[in-house]
């Protein structure tokens, strides 16, 4: 079926629907003239930083009918919309952005929180039974238990029997800790103290999993344990932090349903300062109800 037959079918269908039939465009009279192609809404550039705000706002749909609608849609979500297609395939810039975001997510899982950064924050650092990142990824069970050195350090250097114990751990996203720390921990500790609660010594657990907070709470006699841990990164979002709070945790009896989780803490989700206020209120309600997770009443 050639182009002329396709145009005839289109005209006959539109005529049967009572719509105006588009007139065929007359070919150029100049010998050797090439058909002109309308300019796309955005040009692809190899020099563009694929992680920049400009790259994220890029619209790859060529010749849109309502460009303003696409612009508004692009501003309203971080999802991969309005990227356009090249036949059945994604456009080059959309594909490169996808690959760049995937690489960034892998990097943040494999990166380490620098020891210098931990010291600069004035945090006590302890470890789980894990000794390196590779074992952390392959042996999650060992990331749920403190090393003997960590147990000794916590017993000797931390406040015992606090109302609330705050713990920071790298988890699966180093960037989540380093990017959000300054905006969540100071207001969180200040809010807990203003509420009249006895706050334990905050410390950093390297290679920690969520369940490690059960052993910490039992060891220190904490009523509520709040664990701030890096979330598993998504494509292009490597700075998302989670808070796992649990009341009176015990290694042998606490289950996942006993935890209350606040996730997606970062500048593009729940702002860290706002999350700090929510966590303070959550800790107060846990102490009032003496419960957490599904056992709490709303």
Curated annotation (Swiss-Prot):
One of its GO terms (cellular component) is ethanolamine degradation polyhedral organelle. Its EC number is 4.3.1.7. Adenosylcob(III)alamin binds at residues 210, 231, 261. Gene3D superfamilies: 6.10.140.690, 6.10.250.2060, Ethanolamine ammonia-lyase light chain (EutC). Binds between the large and small subunits. It comes from the Bacteria. Its cofactor is adenosylcob(III)alamin. One of its GO terms (molecular function) is ethanolamine ammonia-lyase activity. The keyword Lyase applies. It holds the Pfam family EutC. Keywords: Bacterial microcompartment, Cobalamin, Cobalt, Lyase. InterPro entries: EutC, EutC_C. One of its GO terms (biological process) is ethanolamine catabolic process. It catalyses: ethanolamine = acetaldehyde + NH4(+). Residues 15-43 are annotated as: Disordered. Catalyzes the deamination of various vicinal amino-alcohols to oxo compounds. Allows this organism to utilize ethanolamine as the sole source of nitrogen and carbon in the presence of external vitamin B12. The basic unit is a heterodimer which dimerizes to form tetramers. The heterotetramers trimerize; 6 large subunits form a core ring with 6 small subunits projecting outwards. PANTHER family: ETHANOLAMINE AMMONIA-LYASE LIGHT CHAIN (PTHR39330), ETHANOLAMINE AMMONIA-LYASE SMALL SUBUNIT (PTHR39330:SF1). This is Ethanolamine ammonia-lyase small subunit.
């Amino acid at each position: 079926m050639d182009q002329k037959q396709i145009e005839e079918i289109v005209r006959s269908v539109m005529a049967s629907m009572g719509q105006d039939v588009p007139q065929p465009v007359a070919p150029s009279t100049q010998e050797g003239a090439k058909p002109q192609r309308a300019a796309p809404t955005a040009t692809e550039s190899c020099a563009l930083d694929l992680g920049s705000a400009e790259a994220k706002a890029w619209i790859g749909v060529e010749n849109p009918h309502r460009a303003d609608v696409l612009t508004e849609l692009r501003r309203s979500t971080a999802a991969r919309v309005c990227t356009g297609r090249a036949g059945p395939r994604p456009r080059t810039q959309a594909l490169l952005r996808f690959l760049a975001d995937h690489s960034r997510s892998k990097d943040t899982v494999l990166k380490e929180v620098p020891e210098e950064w931990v010291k600069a924050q004035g945090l006590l650092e302890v470890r789980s039974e894990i000794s390196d990142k590779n074992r952390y990824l392959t042996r999650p069970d060992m990331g749920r238990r403190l090393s003997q050195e960590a147990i000794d350090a916590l017993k000797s250097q931390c406040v015992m029997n606090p109302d609330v114990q705050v713990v920071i751990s790298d988890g699966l996203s180093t960037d989540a800790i380093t990017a959000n720390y300054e905006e969540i921990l100071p207001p969180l500790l200040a809010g807990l103290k203003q509420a009249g609660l006895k706050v334990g010594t905050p410390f950093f657990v390297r290679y920690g999993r969520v369940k490690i907070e059960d052993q910490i709470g039992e060891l220190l006699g904490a009523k509520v344990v709040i664990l701030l841990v890096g979330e598993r990164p998504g494509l292009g979002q490597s700075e998302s932090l989670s808070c796992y709070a649990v009341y009176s945790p015990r290694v042998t009896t606490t289950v996942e349903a006993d935890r209350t989780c606040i996730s997606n803490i970062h500048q593009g989700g729940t702002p860290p300062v706002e999350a700090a206020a929510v966590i303070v209120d959550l800790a107060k309600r846990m102490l009032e109800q003496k419960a957490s997770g599904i056992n709490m009443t709303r």
